[in-house]
């Protein structure tokens, strides 16, 4: 360690240099390194996840607080609940796979065919399934075709001995700001894509997450707001949050004491926030399945109280009701 006083007495130039080094070191312990100002490409591809002006990729840190924020927060038990990272090493988290033009595509039989994209889908007997091949539950499957930058998502997916079936399915052009038809589900209850809202290990290690994060609530309203396209509830009271509601970690929440990787995630929650996308446990947020996730990181994130969040009003960011393009007022 430098003794800055003695250096100042003996060598003024070295003292100045030492001070700079100390300042840099101090900053590096409090602010996550930002490797980029835009979201990273999907590993194994050159595909970014939607254009930079997509609502998922929009900074909402300056937006006004939603007038229903307090009511929504109470309905989500924010006074007695902490964040819960719903991902980790196998079998936790959402798996995805990268495909290309040579990957065989198949037609899938859908339970909700009228609200599903016909495909075909690059889905096969070895495609990773949420929870594992023998799992129950939602059984999401996600595939990114690197040759066309197309995202394919399935809900309740089964290979079924070569006759694949699923509850629903959706296909997304990752280079465009398209939304699904209003009223359509997807592989998620909100009618939104899942993959853009997942925390990925590669993003955290690169030092920057430039998108909103998917999360769930136990009780949601029978309503959806932009950019969501679908809802799944029979609760009518306005105290319940609708699908598509966006929340952010309050700017004043201190990141002191959190590890570098935890600060990367929490900084994203301050700037890009969380989007309510499905019914589930209150304040569970999602990431990819990855053996490199450390329990020490996940445990830190569980220390964040839900009361440190607030809902925002992003209605002014909407360019068109039928587009995911966003332009928020500065």
Regions found by a protein language model. Give the residues of each.
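Secretory targeting and sorting signals
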Residues: 2-37
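Short, surface-exposed polybasic-aromatic patches that bind anionic ligands, especially phosphate groups
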Residues: 39-330
């Amino acid at each position: 360690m430098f003794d800055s006083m003695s250096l100042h007495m003996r060598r003024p130039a070295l003292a100045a240099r030492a001070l700079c080094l100390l300042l840099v070191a101090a900053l590096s312990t409090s602010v996550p390194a930002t490797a980029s100002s835009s979201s990273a490409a999907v590993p194994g591809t050159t595909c970014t996840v939607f254009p930079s002006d997509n609502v998922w990729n929009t900074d909402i840190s300056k937006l006004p607080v939603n007038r229903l924020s307090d009511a929504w927060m109470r309905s989500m038990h924010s006074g007695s609940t902490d964040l819960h990272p719903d991902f980790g090493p196998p079998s936790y988290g959402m798996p995805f796979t990268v495909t290309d033009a040579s990957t065989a595509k198949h037609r899938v039989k859908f339970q909700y065919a009228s609200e599903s994209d016909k495909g075909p889908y690059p889905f096969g007997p070895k495609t990773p399934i949420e929870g594992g091949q023998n799992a129950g539950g939602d059984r999401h499957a996600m595939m990114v075709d690197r040759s066309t930058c197309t995202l394919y998502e399935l809900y309740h997916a089964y290979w079924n001995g070569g006759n694949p079936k699923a509850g629903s399915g959706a296909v997304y052009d990752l280079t465009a700001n398209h939304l699904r038809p209003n009223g359509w589900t997807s592989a998620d209850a909100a009618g939104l894509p899942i993959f853009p809202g997942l925390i990925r290990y590669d993003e955290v290690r690169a030092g920057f997450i430039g998108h909103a994060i998917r999360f769930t609530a136990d009780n949601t309203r029978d309503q959806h707001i932009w950019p969501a396209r679908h809802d799944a509830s029979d609760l009518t009271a306005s105290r319940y949050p609708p699908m598509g509601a966006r929340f952010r970690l309050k700017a004043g929440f201190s990141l002191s004491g959190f590890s570098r990787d935890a600060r990367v995630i929490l900084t994203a929650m301050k700037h890009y926030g969380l989007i309510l996308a499905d019914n589930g446990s209150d304040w569970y947020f999602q990431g990819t399945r990855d053996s490199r996730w450390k329990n020490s990181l996940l445990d830190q994130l569980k220390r964040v109280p839900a009361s440190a969040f607030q809902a925002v009003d992003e209605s002014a960011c909407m360019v068109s009701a039928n587009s995911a393009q966003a332009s928020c007022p500065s």
